[in-house]
Amino acid sequence: GKLDKNEINTFINLLIEARDQDRQIFIMGNGGSAATASHYCCDFNKGASYGYDKRFKFICLNDNVAGMMAYANDVSYDDVFVEQLKNFYQNGDIVIGISGSGNSKNVINAVEYAKSQGCKVIGITIGLTGFDGGKLRQMAKYSVNMNIDDMQISEDLHMMLDHLSMKVITNNMISETLAKAE
């Protein structure tokens, strides 16, 4: 597989834009992708925000286990993310779906909802996928596809993208701070 540098640069620039415009960034996944989504939330809300005036507003939709299980039990597991988005999504927010296969129904449903709420025009949907990207890659306005036919390596690459993005953004913020001080 090959990583597309333009997809990665676009991803990083969209995160910076969301931070600068005080937008929320919703992120979600299942299984290993859920752990990755939670890790992104931690890294950006603390690691790329603490001590800076401009702060990220990541919200991990798979971290509220009680809420997810209530929707899974009473509505459908396919709707555990979309129902949470209905409470919080605002035009201009970013929705990041992480799915190794690109075909996780509950992630797809959340991205479809975001697009139906104007995300296609104003907001952004980003799909982090593996293999051929599945349905998520086709429907997301932006995607970063880890084109490799191995779930664990795909998940590892999603985590590497987290750390790479965070380091690029924090290094830029340090450079900006130093330039202002001169």
Spans of model-derived segments:
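A short, well-structured juxtamembrane/interface segment
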Residues: 1-21
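Glycine-rich, small/polar surface segments that engage phosphate groups of diverse ligands
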Residues: 17-89
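A short, small-residue-rich loop immediately preceding and capping a beta-strand
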Residues: 24-28, 91-102
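Short glycine/serine/threonine-rich phosphate/pyrophosphate-binding segments
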Residues: 33-38, 103-110
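A charged, well-structured terminal subsegment
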Residues: 87-88, 151-182
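Short, glycine/polar-rich helix-capping loops at beta-to-alpha or helix-loop-helix junctions
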Residues: 123-140
